[in-house]
């Protein structure tokens, strides 16, 4: 069985915020490429992993109905907070860098 994976408007805004932060820190064209690759990795990993095995990842501490997907990238990575809405749909609610303390 395959799940449809959607990103909420908040998750989309989080990706934009993370991308903007990386752009602000960029010194070289390689840094710009890395920023784009990071966002693409988050999108691709969430789509692939959550479409197939959304029940496999840890439950979120603040809400047991939600789960968190760890997305490695470079030396750290990202965390996607998501909820399984139905037997066929998963919604990514928020995304943060692993070094951030909370989602918002």
Please place each PLM-identified region on the residue numbering.
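Basic, Lys/Arg-enriched alpha-helical interface segments
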Residues: 1-67
């Amino acid at each position: 069985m395959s799940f449809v994976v959607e990103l909420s408007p908040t998750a989309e805004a989080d990706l934009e915020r993370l991308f903007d932060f990386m752009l602000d820190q960029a010194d070289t064209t390689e840094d710009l490429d890395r920023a784009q690759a990071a966002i693409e990795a988050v999108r691709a990993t969430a789509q692939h992993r959550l479409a197939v095995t959304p029940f496999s990842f840890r439950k979120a501490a603040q809400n047991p109905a939600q789960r968190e997907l760890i997305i490695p990238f470079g030396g750290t990575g990202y965390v996607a907070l998501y909820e399984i809405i139905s037997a066929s749909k998963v919604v990514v609610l928020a995304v943060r860098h692993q070094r951030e303390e909370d989602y918002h």
